[in-house]
Swiss-Prot record:
The active site is at S370 (charge relay system), D490 (charge relay system), H521 (charge relay system). Its EC number is 3.4.14.11. It catalyses: Hydrolyzes Xaa-Pro-|- bonds to release unblocked, N-terminal dipeptides from substrates including Ala-Pro-|-p-nitroanilide and (sequentially) Tyr-Pro-|-Phe-Pro-|-Gly-Pro-|-Ile. GO terms for molecular function: aminopeptidase activity; dipeptidyl-peptidase activity; serine-type peptidase activity. One of its GO terms (cellular component) is cytoplasm. It comes from Lacticaseibacillus casei (strain BL23). This is Xaa-Pro dipeptidyl-peptidase. The keyword Transmembrane does not apply. InterPro entries: AB_hydrolase_fold, Galactose-bd-like_sf, Pept_S15_Xpro, PepX_N_dom, PepX_N_dom_sf, Xaa-Pro-like_dom, Xaa-Pro_dipept_C. GO terms for biological process: proteolysis. Belongs to the peptidase S15 family.
Amino acid sequence: MKLNQFARLTPDFKVQVAELKQIGLQADPDDAFSQSATDLFNAFFPEAYTLAAKEDKLAQVAVNMDQTLAAWLAKKPSKMTRRDFYNVALQLLGFEAFTDFDLNDPFKMMTATKLPSLDHDLTSTADLLKAVYLLLNTRTKHLVSYLDDLANRGFLKDFQKKQKKPTHLLFNGKVQQVFDARQAVREVVWIESDMDTDHDGQRDLLEATIYRPKATDQGLKVPVLFTANPYFHGTNDVTAVTHVPETTLAVKTHGASKAEVTANPEEPANLPHHPVNGEATQAEAYAEENSMYAFNDYFLARGFAVVYSAGVGTRYSDGFRTTGGPEETDGAVAVIEWLTGKRRAFTNRTDGITIKAWWSTGLVAMTGKSYLATLAMAAATTGVDGLKTIVADAGISSWYDYYRENGLVVAPGGFQGEDADVLAVDTFSRQKSGGDLINIKQAWEKHLATITHDQDRTTGAYNTWWDARNYRKNANKVKADVVLIHGLNDWNVKPTNAIKFWEAIADLPIQKKLVLHQGQHVYVHNVRSLDFLDMMNLWLTHELLGEANGAEDVLPNVVVQDNVAVQTWSAYQNFASPAAEHVTNTRNLKTDFEAATDQFTDHATATFNAQHDTSASFETAIITPNSAYANSRLWLTQPPLERDQTLEGIPHLELTLAIDAPTGILSVRLIDLGMAKRFGETAATVALNGLQLGFDYKTTDILEFKPTAKPTPSKLISLGHINLQNPKNAYEVQRITPGQPFHISLDLQPTHYHLPAGRQLALVIHGADMAQTIRPIKTTHYQIDLANSSITLPYRI
């Protein structure tokens, strides 16, 4: 086990003492050592209400092989050895003596686990207080810090009773859980937008669900975590509308210019406002939906309000879904504008009674994963005031990069046949309310048909519809600080979405952080080896509470999880830069790779059907050395590595080839070859319900990325797809003369990948990708000019 920690601060001793006192501990350096030790260790069992109960708890802790903590304290000690203190500390952190560590040498385990410690014996009360302060900021076996663990057991439950008025509590630069999340005020309002997406002549009203600390009713104003979540009110069965992958790849006869595919913002319609008949300070509707994001729940107990809005076309709101269109961005912005006092909302949909977010400080962070993170990124590119930061996990920065690639229809990994129209149906939760649907069904079906037409599955080309959903075009407007989190094995929302957005905001005068993990499309806030919750606590305390805690400097610019060394996260200055830390090597496919042939015929669709494969089984088979698809691919290998190497950046392919057809699909996979137990792409549960989100409150599982039980022969590092008629970009078209050579350039997905010595790099070049592209039934023959083809590989040195 490794408990990496990036968010721990080390303030000077005076600050440490003041903070210890602030949380209710006896922390006077002039007190006698024995009395201070007794007071402090007793305080660490808040679940024990009496001295007798605390004595029993102390007796359960071993100081060394000869004494319990109760017996040691009874002797009124005047000092404590470093070893004895950390024997006690480890047990307080949830580790077991004799099982997890040796009482004669706790430091062996602490070093392996990356736990901090003082380097000397405790010979004064000041030493004891320093050790206790560090202990409170040390991570437990249950992922959270020790102070968090104490608070989860009731240590801070009476904090507000001792205050003249409700307030936030900061410790080590981070806000603490001194609010009872169980008592949160739950309410619903309807925010008036500027849009009419369902074409009924009225401004769409957007439902927003609010959970705010009860202390706001006593005058406390709080910042807001806002999650734009299209799934919040449920999803629909999309089996009937999911596309069957087409069997014919269309020959493109004409392309377009950049000007022709550039979307121009539409002028907002001059719509009448909803009438206003009064103002209220109390909502009329209870929030019946439960908060569904553990990250937000964690901060609710720390004095942040949490707001969810599903947006246009969802249950209890007006409008139609547009799958990432400007209307969905505007819907998210409308919520922020209400939270900052710049837009009206109503207590219900009919009476015209307005309500303000009087409890809000007007400082907002947007959070969430996938579609939720996408809308956070979209809102940030508007430059809306009040949005201080986004914490965007696996977000889409351009919808073309989600459903298309280089002129091809390319489904997100795991969702073959999905497209923008399918997702629109999936999230159109208005249809769950029959009384609502009967009035809009015909208009919705007409609207949906427009999406199906405009997404253009026939050519897969980039057009104005996709351009309107490319948020990177407006990245220069971003004013909010940005945290991006992405899985390096996320083939659903592929890594290019994060890295291209990261590059687009690189020169902006904002703070920005990037976290890359080895998972697929998953969260990392409950991954034990990373102190992600503390990192974001430090970040949000700075961003939303204005605390000068140095978060922008303390937190690394880039944190990357290693794919070989378990539970290892490394800090870097940037991704794929600076130049002094990176090198690119261009390798010729003929002289630097071994290949049995330079040609293949793509029979993948026939093989797929004959093998009764699925998308998942195909993805395994296509990168397996001995495979049913061996004759439908080109397999190139490099010699085994003599030393460890780390790929970091965007692999780039230059390929000269000829095909026997006027169009074709080319897929490329970069492979780690060699039998090994590699990390699973989904973190395994290590403690069911082990992460507590607040005192007597919700829990979630603690996870960890682990090597698989059985070795595998290969693993996908990166991949890419291209329509061979689109060698330059996704809108200009090249005519292909069958049998005549031509050249293409192809970027693969960004990666950070540790290749151990002895492994081999392999390059798989094939045609249709059964898991992601369409599935043509016509076979195509590919002839690769290996001598005039190369791959450029970026390395961190």
